[in-house]
């Protein structure tokens, strides 16, 4: 009789063209397909980080209900078209970009001037049409965020500092355009009551469908990890008393932090603090790590993400650590 829950062993990714893919996992215990599929779907739609234009300033325009001489579209339609531009920022969370175009012709996303660490995924996206003598000069602020944030929320918060002509946009940050899931039947040997989960996902190109599913799973792991640390049963999954009364640690805690494959900067900062094993690391709190010289918020987030992918978090408690057999460094 098998008492342990089945874990999916077969993973298949089927590319459907464009930025769409189907990710299939099996087998799951009966009911787990819907349990996990619905959770992944909600995270994919609402919690994935992305980038969007949040503020615009257009030369000669005081508000969005305006028109521009020589431009076919009014300002409202220009802003709607601008929301369709897909941005991807590397190593930064916000940037202000410029777009300057004059003379007859199309204005596309490729006309936006970008630094080396800003990428436009759909450069052929049309923003406006200029007629002879037309001119369009605008500044575009792009920020990183999650979900959908109405412009009224930000506009109310910074009303005293709002400059004339600064237009606040509703921002849809999510890189996931559409996601659905189905649960099919799976079979393992004589068991035919198992689930197969198929996630059908389409993104805007800023992230691949596979990476989106992977990132959403990491978010779920990070959010659920805290339940393993409920007061009175800290690390119940990792600390199991042996028959002799000694403490048995999960093998992952005994591995060196080098196996986490952190950046060189983060790894060196940890070693400078005598953090050599994963068990050493998870007992540190965020505040303690931020006090480490040369370890900033970016490195901290990297460490948290790597730990979350393994079902671990910072601030965990380990009794009887380190084990006597652990190598001293």
From Swiss-Prot:
Task: Name the reaction it catalyses.
Answer: RNA(n) + a ribonucleoside 5'-triphosphate = RNA(n+1) + diphosphate
Lineage of the source organism? Bacteria, Pseudomonadati, Pseudomonadota, Betaproteobacteria, Burkholderiales
Its family remark reads:
Belongs to the RNA polymerase alpha chain family.
> Which EC number(s) does UniProt give?
2.7.7.6
InterPro entries on file: DNA-dir_RNA_pol_insert (IPR011262), DNA-dir_RNA_pol_RpoA/D/Rpb3 (IPR011263), DNA-dir_RpoA (IPR011773), RBP11-like (IPR036603), RNAP_asu_C (IPR011260), RNApol_insert_sf (IPR036643)
Summary of subunit composition and partner proteins: Homodimer. The RNAP catalytic core consists of 2 alpha, 1 beta, 1 beta' and 1 omega subunit. When a sigma factor is associated with the core the holoenzyme is formed, which can initiate transcription.
Q: Where is this region: Alpha N-terminal domain (alpha-NTD)?
A: 1-231
Q: Name one GO biological process term.
A: DNA-templated transcription
Q: Know anything about its domains from the record?
A: The N-terminal domain is essential for RNAP assembly and basal transcription, whereas the C-terminal domain is involved in interaction with transcriptional regulators and with upstream promoter elements.
Read off the HAMAP family from this record.
RNApol_bact_RpoA
Q: What does this protein do?
A: DNA-dependent RNA polymerase catalyzes the transcription of DNA into RNA using the four ribonucleoside triphosphates as substrates.
Q: State the species of origin.
A: Albidiferax ferrireducens (strain ATCC BAA-621 / DSM 15236 / T118)
At the top level, the lineage of the source is Bacteria
Key words of the record: DNA-directed RNA polymerase, Nucleotidyltransferase, Transcription, Transferase
**One Pfam family linked to the record:** RNA_pol_A_bac
What is the protein's name according to its record? DNA-directed RNA polymerase subunit alpha
> What GO cellular component is one of the record's annotations?
DNA-directed RNA polymerase complex
Q: Which EC class heads this enzyme's classification?
A: transferase
Instruction: State one molecular function term (GO).
Output: DNA binding
């Amino acid at each position: 009789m098998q008492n342990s829950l089945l874990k999916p062993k077969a993973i298949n990714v089927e590319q459907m063209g464009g930025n769409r893919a189907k990710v299939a996992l099996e087998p799951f215990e009966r009911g787990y397909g819907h349990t996990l599929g619905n959770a992944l779907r909600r995270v994919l739609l609402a919690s994935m980080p992305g980038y969007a234009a949040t503020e615009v300033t257009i030369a000669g325009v005081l508000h969005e209900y305006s028109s521009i001489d020589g431009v076919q579209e009014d300002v409202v339609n220009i802003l709607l078209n601008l929301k369709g531009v897909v941005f991807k920022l590397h190593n930064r969370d916000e940037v202000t970009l410029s777009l300057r175009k004059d003379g007859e012709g199309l204005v596309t996303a490729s006309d936006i001037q970008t630094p080396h660490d800003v990428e436009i995924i759909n450069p052929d996206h049309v923003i406006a049409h200029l007629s002879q003598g037309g001119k369009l000069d605008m500044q575009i602020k792009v920020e990183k965020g999650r979900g959908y944030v109405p412009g009224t929320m930000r506009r109310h918060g910074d009303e005293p500092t709002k400059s004339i002509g600064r237009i606040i946009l509703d921002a849809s940050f999510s890189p996931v355009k559409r996601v659905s899931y189905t649960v099919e039947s799976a079979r393992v040997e004589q068991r035919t009551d198992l689930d197969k989960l198929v996630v059908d996902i389409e993104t805007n190109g800023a992230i691949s469908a596979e990476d989106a599913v992977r990132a959403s799973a990491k978010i779920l792991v990070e959010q659920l990890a805290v339940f393993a640390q409920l007061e009175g049963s800290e690390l119940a999954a990792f600390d199991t008393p042996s028959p002799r009364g000694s403490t048995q640690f999960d093998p992952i805690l005994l591995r060196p932090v080098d196996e986490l494959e952190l950046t060189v900067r983060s790894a060196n900062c940890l070693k400078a603090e005598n953090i050599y094993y994963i068990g050493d690391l998870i007992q540190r709190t965020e505040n303690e790590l931020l006090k480490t010289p040369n370890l900033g918020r970016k490195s901290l987030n990297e460490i948290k993400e790597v730990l979350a992918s393994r079902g671990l978090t910072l601030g965990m408690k380990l009794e009887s650590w380190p084990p006597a057999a652990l190598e001293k460094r």
